[in-house]
Amino acid sequence: MNRTACRLMVGVCLSLPGAAFASPPLPTDPRIQTGQLANGVKWVFYENANPPGKLYFMMHVRTGSLNETDEQRGLSHFLEHMAFNGTENFPPGQLIPFFESIGMKFGADLNASTSYDRTNYSLNLPTTQPEQIDKALMTLSDYAFRMLLDEKEIDEERGVILEESRSRKSASQRIREKLWPELFEGSRFAVRVPIGIEEVIAGAPRSEFVKYYRTWYRPENVTVIMAGDTKVQPILPMLEKWFGAYRSEVPAAEPLPAGLKPFDRERAIVVSDPEQTSCSVQLCNVLPGRPSAATVEQFRVELLEELATRLFMRRCDERIKKGEAAFRGAQAGVEDFFREAVMVTAAASGEPGDWNKMLEQLIIELRRACEQGFTDYELDLVKKQTLASAERGVRVEPTISSSSILKTLVASVHDGEPVLSAQQYLDLVREILPGITASEVGETFKGHFDRRTYAYVLTIPEKPGLPVPARDDVLAAARAAWARRLEQTSAQQVAATLPPVNGTGRIVDAVTEEQFGVTSAWLENGIRVHHRYMDYKKDQVLVRINFAGGGIEETADNLGVTSVASLVFTAPATSQLSSTAIRDLRAGVNISVGGGMADDETFSVRLGGSPNDLEFGLHLAHTLMTDGRIEETVFKNWRISTLRSLEKRERDVGAHAADALAELISGGDPRRRTVRKEEVERLTLEQGQAWFERICRQAPAEVAIVGDISWEQVRPLVERYLGTLPTRPRSAGHLDELRTLRRKSGPLVANLTVNTLTPAAVAYAGFIGCEGRHVDDRRALQIAESIISTRLIKRVREELALVYSISASNSAAWIYRDAGLFRAGSKCKPENAELVAQEVHAILRDFAETGPTAEELDNARKQILNRLDVGIREPDYWLGFLEHLDLHGRSLSEITSQRDHYERLTAADVQAAFRKYYVPARMFTVTAVPAEASAVAAGGVGSVTAAASQPE
């Protein structure tokens, strides 16, 4: 639905609508190759060696749910499922096993999606071998033209899609179903949600599938998009072989419009739901549509629109941080809808009782921007950031991934807009940006937002003691805000700088492991530093400054205090600089600085961006670590947001199931459960501030720096900005006594009923897995995870149609002793929750008894090694390993031993490791189901029970 003004390979494009002007056309990246077969099938190719030796495909079919008739509502999405359930060259049950046999994983490497006006099929090949490319193109062409649509397979898939529909049910879904038909009255868009309606999913005859398929899956609607490490010339004959011969047998049909009409009057819409906890006010307006952006002039128009909405949101953000706003969040946007309309929106969210204030303040801010415009100071800050992002785009483009390129190309194909190279984009920005004035930006904003044909939409909880306002009251409040006298204001200019860092620290010991390219050093203040140079991603550096402690140190008396301490990074401020001042200081800087509670044992400061700006990032991080402050407004908003989140969890079966599982495997340790309402209410800003200062000043620290910067370049920065932090212990031994959980012996069982309107349950089953330090067991269980996931999909999803999505997950324990988690589960029908858990245990039990087959082991090994081949090249991979290298007592040899170890693992090894952990004392089962109507009326939330019987 969004359209990108100028598609860029670097992800720094502008998402804005466009219009056609008599202006030079936008350029196109010359590296993109395109063509068309005689029957109308189009292709797009981009040669790219990141990752090396891989080739990624996306087939774009220009049709979606908008083209469905009343009898076909949901069949565009249903068809996408059927592509995996039988084609001419892959009879039912053969497609997924084949691709798994060459190292691909269903979901990650083989997938599809359906929207209102498009259907996309993705296929990521692990190699560029001609035979694999040929199979990929055969598969995609089968999707396009040769689905079998076997009646038996259709009937078996109905249950899966009904469960997919169930998995999406929520308060938000119910609000959408009430709101859209009225907000977008008379449109097809409002009544053509891709998931469809249950009557059609459950009962549509095969003839309707065939009718939709043959009408819309036709050559002129198909584009094959490719990005990867090969040449296009050898691929073209294969494209012709598989795609070129097909001719549609039915006449072409005109695509059906979304039917969106420009709004022509003011109105108010109020939508409520008993399980909605937050409140939002929205100003929505639909304006006439515009063609795809294709000219330099339209690029300029869209750049103006982007600057204008960003400036407006900066103002709202400033009001929030100063405590002047009733809302906790606000945004504005200009968005294209299917080339038929332009949606203009402004929205704010906050407390239900403040809806009137939020609406008034949002309108006042809109009026201020429309009537008074923006200042040169404000615009200069946003211009700096825009230019800096464009300049960095040129530096990162050479190593952008093929998957990112593919997404950009698909969006371009769909929207009919050119793809600019990073340099082309930068050239345009440099040419246009200096001539844009604050007055012009203000007029652009006014042209979109100063219109009185808004729909004022209020979404609000429906609960005792909270009156739901009448529509007339909302409309009257909006009109009063438009009529209110507007005071003249101006943006404050804050001339701020970061305080100087006095002195410098010293590295007292540094060792380079040449085999791994890793340098590990000690600063004289006790901070450990690991560095690895990598230019796999150009102009990127990632930094983690990890302080040992935080959540693991909390007690029943201060639960949640680490989350409060994390607020220093939500809106960075110091004793001398407000969060707004620091925000302005960061304009034009291509590095992010954030942080907070990373996990129970780590409080982290996180940096990421351009090495050119690393010194600024470390300087800011040093300033926050030594003088960071939690602003009062930030704390108040956190408390309210957290309480609303807890309120929402009360009616969420998934949240109840997760909490119950955490309680079972931890023995009820309060550190492992969700914080409670009364605990949030007693936490203070002062507690969080003191906790933050203690951690930053005293906790052992381990730092990882990975990216396109050498040790020689980074060393002086480390000594200056990390070496001048307070001295601390080298070891985190003080945490050892906190790592033990007092779990009861199993089997552990929790069966809950939850007071909710959503007709869905959750079932989990599994066992306590291994600790991370047990490398052999950890890798054997990773193999088991992959194999069991495939078995679960085949049995629980495909054969029994009990769930939409299910897989196994193996998480080794690094923080708490003997607390690894191997589990599987899913949402399902309430009456099927127990059966889902039983089926999971049956598969786990069978695996323990018989182990993997030779074929399963070979497939799982290939999949893991394929992911490893891609992942080990990424800076993120090395950062994740190095940031806890000492804390977890790990060895760099783990990395080099992985491939050989996985290749040596036998079926007996995997089975033996699995049997070690899948024993009654370590098993668990959790179900959470909606309460009966009587329980709901009584307001009960049900109970948790423990049992000591062997799961079925």
For each of these PLM feature ranges, what is it?
Residues 1-7:
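Positively charged n-region of N-terminal signal peptides that target proteins for export
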Residues 21-45, 223, 231-303, 309-317, ...:
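Proteolytic maturation boundary segments
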Residues 153-166, 171-219, 225-227, 232-239, ...:
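Hydrophobic, small-residue-rich alpha-helical packing segments that form membrane-like cores
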Residues 7-19:
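Bacterial N-terminal signal peptides
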Residues 82-90:
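Metal-associated gating/positioning segment near the N- to mid-region
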Residues 355-357, 448-450, 694-697, 917:
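Edge/loop elements at the starts and ends of beta-strands within beta-rich repeat scaffolds
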Residues 46-47, 51-78, 93-142, 173-199, ...:
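M16 family metallopeptidases and their MPP-like homologs
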Residues 150, 248-253, 371-379, 631, ...:
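Flexible helix-coil linker/hinge segments at domain or subdomain boundaries
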